[in-house]
From Swiss-Prot:
Protein name from the UniProt record: Glutamine synthetase
Residues annotated for L-glutamate binding in this entry: G229, R283, E289, R301, R320
Gene Ontology MF annotations: ATP binding; glutamine synthetase activity; metal ion binding
Species whose genome carries this gene: Pyrococcus woesei
Subunit structure: Oligomer of 12 subunits arranged in the form of two hexagons.
Catalytic activity: L-glutamate + NH4(+) + ATP = L-glutamine + ADP + phosphate + H(+)
NCBIfam families, alphabetized: GlnA
Cofactor: Mg(2+)
Enzyme Commission no: 6.3.1.2
Domain of life, per lineage: Archaea
Enzyme class: ligase
Length: 439
């Protein structure tokens, strides 16, 4: 978008523009400027203190600059403000730890190989009443696909969907999820960078609408023990010269199979990025549809990677372990880098399954070469430290990310020790609610 065009889009009521980026956790950060400074934000950038942003700079060298991307300009329908995403710079160069910049560079590497990545997410969330404590009240008792009186939140879902096009998101399916007060709104796939932006926007819209109704929306992976967790399955495909290269004559192409092979090979390290919280691993337990075993299959929802039945031009894979606590820019960069590694080195997929993996004996899983995903954030971080490809995907953010997450894990272990709780507890603790509820 030409900046002069974007300036002409201003509604007279728009007086301020929010400059939005995300921190190491994927949490939106930013600042507001008068609308008259938008052109300056695009051309010269607006400086800010990077030491105040989790995972960015230290106080001894904290000056960063945000440059707005005018193509992302939107006006917030319920407020007299506009929003814009952008890229971060340091010393007049792209800042190496900028999450959005990291994904941009990963996509440029894909493009050098002739590929363009498309991703469609399925983010799940809960709606709660909060009464001043961490006793979460459930406002409805609906279940999966309920559309009758048990589903009290249908109007809230519709309102969220009505606002989404104003932010460039196209809603496709709205429904109640399995858990009481759990919901899902799927939106149309797009190019990977746009989809990552869309995830940040979707969480913003959902939380804002929930608040209008006196509720809290949480994307925390497992807010309640004994209830289904919030996932964010990713539907992924690659195109080349406008054609879906995952499309084979029957089923998937060789490129798609190698892409799967790359993800399977790096799955143990990837999970530290796609499921980056202590709480994430309380969702990834047997008994629910969240995957635990490293496997793949056609139509099989017990596998880590499912190939949906829609082949031909709609050919894609569904990566089922990610959750909405992930920083979408980091997660997409890591997954695409792993898949590209599979394509470059022609890694064949392994651990193909047609039956329910959870119902297999341990002996059968071993025979098929099916391994288990890390069972905790600590285990996942150990795997990440050993994986060159996934580490490189995070670029200059890797060091800050791994250090930040190790401190997070150690803080949790200290809490458990203080409360005399076992390290492998699957109970959702107050420590987790305080830390992750508003992610």
């Amino acid at each position: 978008m030409n900046i002069s065009v974007s300036m002409n889009k201003f509604d007279s009521k728009i007086k301020f523009v929010q400059l939005v980026f995300v921190d190491i956790n994927g949490m939106p950060k930013g600042m507001e400027i008068p609308a008259s400074r938008l052109e300056e934000a695009v051309t010269d950038g607006i400086s800010f203190d990077g030491s105040s942003v989790p995972g960015f700079q230290g106080i001894e060298d904290s000056d960063l600059v945000f440059k707005a991307d005018p193509d992302t300009y939107v006006e917030v329908p319920w407020d007299n403000v506009a929003r814009v995403y952008g890229f971060i710079y340091k010393d007049n160069k792209p800042y190496g730890a900028d999450p959005r910049g990291i994904l941009k560079r990963a996509l440029e590497e894909l493009e050098k190989e002739g590929y363009k990545a498309y991703i469609g997410p399925e983010p799940e969330f809960y709606l709660f009443k909060k009464n001043g404590t961490w006793e979460l009240e459930i406002p409805d008792v609906g279940g999966y696909f309920d559309i009758l009186t048990l589903d009290k939140a249908r109007d809230i879902r519709r309102e969220i969907a009505e606002y989404m096009p104003s932010f460039g998101l196209i809603p496709e399916v709205l429904h109640h999820e399995v858990g009481k007060a759990q919901h899902e709104i799927d939106f149309r796939y797009d190019e990977a960078l746009k989809t990552a932006d869309n995830i940040v926007s979707f969480k913003y819209i959902t939380k804002a609408v929930a608040e209008m109704h006196g509720l809290y929306a949480t994307f925390m992976p497992k807010p309640l023990f004994g209830f289904p967790g919030n996932g964010m399955h990713l539907h992924i495909s690659l195109s080349k010269d406008g054609e879906n290269v995952f499309m084979g004559e029957e089923g998937l192409s060789e490129i798609a199979l190698h892409f799967i092979g790359g993800i399977l090979k790096h799955a143990k390290a990837l999970i530290a990025v796609t499921n980056p919280t202590v709480n994430s691993y309380k969702r990834l337990v047997p008994g629910y549809e969240a995957p635990v075993y490293i496997s793949w299959g056609y139509r099989n929802r017990s596998a880590l990677i499912r190939v949906p039945a829609f082949w031909g031009k709609g050919a894609r894979i569904e990566y089922r372990c990610p959750d909405p606590s992930a920083n979408p820019y980091f997660a997409f960069a890591a997954v695409l880098k792993a898949g590209l590694d599979g394509i470059k080195h022609k890694i064949d997929p392994f651990a193909y399954v047609e039956e329910n993996v959870y119902e297999m004996s341990e002996e059968k899983r071993k025979e098929l070469g099916i391994e288990t995903l890390p069972g905790s954030l600590g285990e996942a971080l150990e795997e990440l430290e050993k994986d060159k490809v996934v580490k490189e995907a995070l670029g200059d953010a890797y060091k800050n990310f791994i250090n930040y997450k190790w401190k997070e894990w150690e803080s949790y272990l200290e809490y458990l020790e203080e409360k005399h709780m076992p390290k492998d507890t699957k109970k959702v603790t107050e420590w987790e609610l305080e830390r992750y509820f508003f992610l």
